Amino acid sequence: MKFSYTLLLAFWVFSGWSQNEVSIYTERQGSDVIVYADNPAVIPMTAEIKLNLTNMKTDFGGDEGLFVIPQKAERHQLLSAKATRQVGKIGLGLESIIYIGDVLNQSETEHIYELPFASGMTYQISQGYNGRFSHKGVNAIDFAMDVGEKVYAARGGIVYRVVQKNSKSCQHSSCQEYNNYIMIYHDDGTFSEYSHLKYNGADVKVGDRVKTGDLIGFSGNTGWSSGPHLHFVVYKYDQKGNRQSLKTKFRTKDQGDTILQEQGSYTKE
């Protein structure tokens, strides 16, 4: 049997950003073509693959799909394709988009979060879900915390991203790039993000596995902010890489497990 093999196209782009670059590449094994991925990141990534096949058939029977790449994976096989004829030209064109996290994990389990501050403390919600200043269309919460107050993990997970180099702030969206924040990935595929931390205000690093209630940083007033506070949001990515913020319930001392309301004050047990 004699084949001529053509790799028609191979490139990858990223939805949002990633801590480390995911690599997708092919390898010829006889008349088969194997598609592999390397993922140096500390959390899983998802590859959306679209193929242009010439006289080839994939092991999953289609020409596009979503494939989860485990964290720290090297040479992880995504798919393979076989020739459908014994002689002649075969080819595999490949396009991919990389989404952060495991977007195939769409579990709807309701998790009760701990308030992200010290036990016995009480804070007011200065801006709630879909708030008028900077939360329009976003399920995020602002806790009215002064600069330098301790911030604790509301839920355990893996620290995916830490930014703490910024000191600038203003009341305009143009300052959003100056947010200091910590981003934590959870086992159900969701993320939690703690924003406006003070300069050098992180007490964790990328790759740390934190437990609920661990100290992770210190509140501040960086980025797009009208004053000192802690911005907290939980979100997931759908199967097209679109970010969806989620309403969450918190465990409180006096109101039980509840959704926090703007201007309400809540105490941690």
Question: Where are the language model's segments positioned?
Answer:
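Short, well-structured beta-strand-loop connectors
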Residues: 151-161, 203-219
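Acidic, glycine-rich catalytic/binding loops that coordinate metals and/or anionic ligands
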Residues: 111-118, 126, 172, 202-211, ...
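Surface-exposed, glycine-biased beta-strand/turn segments
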Residues: 68-70, 75-178
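Zn2+-dependent peptidoglycan hydrolase active-site motif and core
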Residues: 154-199, 203, 228
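C-terminal soluble interaction/assembly domains
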Residues: 215, 225-227, 241-244
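Cationic-aromatic interfacial patches
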Residues: 19-73
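Bacterial Sec-dependent N-terminal signal peptides
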Residues: 1-22, 37
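A residue-level detector for short acidic-glycine micro-motifs
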Residues: 127, 161, 196-199, 221, ...
